[in-house]
Amino acid sequence: MRNILLCENMTKVQKEVRCDHCGTSQGSKSVFSGQKVFLGRKITDVLETITHRSIPSSLPIKICFVCTSTFMSSAALIEKVRETVDRVQEQPAKKTKVAEIEEPSTQESDKKAVKVPKKNTTLRQRSKSIAAFPPSFVNGANTNTEIEIISASPKKLDKTPKKQISRLFEDNLNDSVKLTPAKEVSSTKKAFLNLFGNGGNDAIEVLTESEEEEDSDKGPITINTNNFQCPECEFHAKFPKPYKEHLQKEHGLQRPRIYPCTLCIKTFGVLKTLKNHLRDTHSRTFESEAKTKAKESKEKEAKSGAKNKIDAKAKETNAVSQRKKPKEKKSKEKKTEIKCNVETKVVDEIDDQVNNKKGTDSEDADQTQATKIASFKALNESLMKKRMLENVIDSEYTFAINGSSASTPRADSNNFQCEICDCELMTAKQMQEHMKTVHSIDKPKVFKCHVCEKSLATKQSLKTHMTLHADGAEAPNSSKRKILQDEDEDVDILGTTQIENTAEKVEGPKKSQQSPTKAAKFTNRKILQEEDEVVEIVDAFKTDNTAEDDEGPAEEKIIRSRNNIQHQVDGGMIAPRSPAKKTKKTSHVDLSVSTTNGNSPAKSEKRKKQDKSEDTLPSSDVDIVEEINYNVRPHKKARLESIGDSTADESTLSCDRCGKFVKSRQRLDSHMEKKHAAKLQCTLCKEVYQNQMDYVAHFSNCGSEGGLPCGVANCKKVFTEANFLSSHLRKRH
């Protein structure tokens, strides 16, 4: 029981809250916070009316019920006092209005007593409203009040010029007009003021000033972009970048705006935005100070040059006129007239010359521009025709392909179409992303051959593939690209080759040709490489017309074959390869020489010919031969691509582990090295796996808290999920 009572007392103590105003502690229900409403008003609003301060709504104030009731009564008292003060302040204003109404009535009573001649009816129309007041109100006014009202009326009339003018007319003027304009005359009353001869000059001046302002507004705005002064310190910079860095580092401005607009308050951080702002909002152009200075200097030079020319012409004419002067004296007036006429004539002549020059220059410029435009048009027409022909494919068009029944077929569109969902996209990159995201194909083959409909992954591979079709169309009987296996032996072909030939290797009859004169002939070295079969080398040498050498230039045919006897060729010049084909591996070349005479020549004769040809070779050819790299090997990637593209009677090979089919032995070796040669060793359990799937699957039993490491020796990557690891092993290793 004691414990229960203690708990109840504790709860009572906790619920009691202390008042901030009177300090008494009461229950939480009888205490009001700042947000609570008492008799339709918040406690904070009541405190603001009493203290005349702005009190935040989140003020942690607590007031008891008694204090809040006293605050409410004091707030009501303050509001009542305000109302009485406002009511008292409004009463004097009403009395002054009554005084203003009484003033014209007293003046009218005085005017009735004294006989006054008639006034202008137009000026007395304002005083007709006085008849509305009773006569007792007018007669009962005291003289003292009249004097006070009259003395006080001009002070109020200063604020209203219309009333002041009317009162002055009624009091002081008889059949006369006096104008007292206000400080600023409105535009609507300028015409009325001009009737009396005043304000005309002002209006003209205003118009001229406005016109000048409009003319000045149309010109470009010049801003100095090479002088930046910090307004907060003495920092000075010539370029914007260091000035921005200074404002960011020293003054803490995150985005400093260093280009202010001279026509408004806005500032900009980039000069381009300032130019756009001036163009769009103010319809003005921007010019730097350097450009304006250059323009001004050019204008000054042009003006000074024109003045100098005019002065020189005037001096010349004066000298001529002085020589041709008659002896008779003329009056000063005639002399001045002659001088003026001469100067005007000189100016007219200069203007005519300038106009003639401009006309001739403009005609020449028009002629040159016309020729240029004609040439440009011709070039553009030829280029457009070429582009149109390039867009049209050589294959036969049908209306069914284009999907139209028009009389003229259209060129195929360059859009890429998905074979799965028939989606058309503009670029190859978009199609690749579409195939990856929508159809989940890792390596999409987007480029398609229009001849054999083979799909390829890159544009370069499509080009190399198209060369195969082009080679097949040009030479259908020639065999396709052959892979030459011996890489270390190079074929060097020169115009002067040393060949050991016998009578058994002669293939054709000798052709006898005689040189008609002893004149020297040009050495022409033509190396013609046919489609992987025949290379013809034609050498025309300088020969002497002797009994021993009656033979003309020899034509040598070098035929590549596998079964003939191999001869190593000495020399240094390699036969150029066609640019469309890829680099091929060089190997042994079997040579069979067809000489130009009836019998096979002796070795001594050939050696003599060789010595002569070497003597006749120019020094430039020798230098070129010496600079040639004889041991050129194709790049590994190009070699592998040529191996992969070759289809010359190759049997397909298959991998004994995964069953993949390849077309060459080197492809199979590279596949074995990449996929099956690497051993995967787990860094956690130290087990070795040959298969990638087994290695990834063993992590279900092995602890994978620290991640899934790549099992390759030199690879240190770690992955969080198994699919990431498997894709890494499949693509990289």
Swiss-Prot record:
Major place of residence: nucleus
Biological process annotations from GO: maintenance of rDNA; negative regulation of transcription by RNA polymerase II; positive regulation of transcription by RNA polymerase II; regulation of transcription by RNA polymerase II
Superkingdom to which the source organism belongs: Eukaryota
PTM-bearing positions, type Phosphothreonine: 180, 188, 647
Biased composition, class Polar residues, residue ranges: 592-602
Other comments on record: Named after the Hindu god Indra who lost immortality due to a curse from Durvasa, likely referring to mutants displaying a loss of germline immortality.
Recorded family membership: Belongs to the krueppel C2H2-type zinc-finger protein family.
Name of the protein in its database record: Zinc finger protein indra
Encoding gene, per UniProt annotation: indra
